[in-house]
Design a protein with these regions (language model features):
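ATP-binding N-terminal substructure of ATP-dependent carboxylate-amine bond-forming enzymes
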Residues: 1-7, 24, 211-215, 233
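A short, GP-enriched loop/loop-strand-helix hinge that lies immediately N-terminal to
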Residues: 1-13, 26-34
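Basic phosphate/pyrophosphate-binding loop/patch that engages nucleotide-derived ligands
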Residues: 21-28, 69, 79-80
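ATP-dependent carboxylate/phosphate-activation module, predominantly the ATP-grasp catalytic core
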Residues: 90-97, 101-159, 163, 170, ...
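Glycine-rich active-site loop/lid that clamps phosphate-bearing ligands
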Residues: 231-237
């Protein structure tokens, strides 16, 4: 058995589709432009963010400071896209957060939020996660403003199983969704979810794969904090 459908996976991997879903559910995102629209923008509208439509790991991402750099950034982003397409949008100045949810047996439960710092590795490297600290300093504001809308989005997509995470920007306490993963993250974040919120995402996915039931999902926030600090030894490690 598989915890997701190909339609769900494609909609969440495709940054354009994901942001359209967010907007339909009243969740803010960065303003997006077509290539033709971007060509007509005044320099005062810059910087822009240019990225592959369906890429990952910040590969092919560029912060474009002026109109003269747009074409090169688009070409680079397209080279990293499976679909050969790109996203052009406002560059958001703000801190990043990672928001976690867990789905099991049709129940979808908020499972934490962490403040995220990124660092560029080497001159030619892409920015990658350098530190996460949970809970986020603005956790309650997120819960008050967007938690219900995010859960409604997942339910409207028919999601019933699996780990979910969202990268969002926190701009002075206002959140803008950026992208989403319908899978485990690459930083063993299911440990964070288990230790800080009492939800075992790995056990829930094992149960789904074997036809079992991991029981009712109940978030039990713990006191204290949890940090993820990856040590990058060399490129690729």
């Amino acid at each position: 058995p598989c915890y997701c459908t190909s339609e769900q996976f494609d909609a969440l991997r495709d940054k354009g589709q994901f942001k359209a879903l967010c907007q339909a559910h009243g969740i803010p995102t960065a303003r997006r432009y077509s290539y033709q629209e971007a060509q007509c923008l005044p320099e005062s509208a810059y910087p822009l963010a240019v990225k592959p439509l369906d890429g990952s790991g910040s590969r092919g991402f560029s912060k474009v400071a002026n109109p003269g750099d747009l074409d090169a950034a688009v070409a680079q982003a397209r080279s990293f896209s499976f679909a050969g397409d790109v996203v052009i949008e406002d560059f958001i100045e703000g801190d990043a957060v990672i928001i976690h949810y867990t789905a099991h047996q049709g129940s979808i439960v908020y499972s934490g939020i962490a403040d995220k710092c990124s660092q560029k590795m080497g001159d030619a490297g892409a920015p990658i996660m350098a530190l996460q600290i949970a809970p986020s300093r603005d956790e309650q504001k997120y819960l008050d403003e967007l938690n219900d809308k995010a859960i409604a989005l997942f339910k409207d997509m028919g999601i019933t199983e699996g780990p979910l995470w969202i990268e969002a920007f926190n701009r002075n306490g206002s959140f803008l969704f950026n992208e989403m993963g319908f899978r485990f993250g690459g930083s063993l974040t299911y440990y964070l979810v288990r230790e800080m919120y009492g939800i075992d995402q790995l056990a829930a996915l094992y149960a789904c794969a074997t036809g079992g039931n991991a029981g009712e999902l109940i978030a039990r926030p713990a006191a204290g904090a949890y940090a993820i600090w990856p040590l990058h030894l060399k490129p690729g490690v």
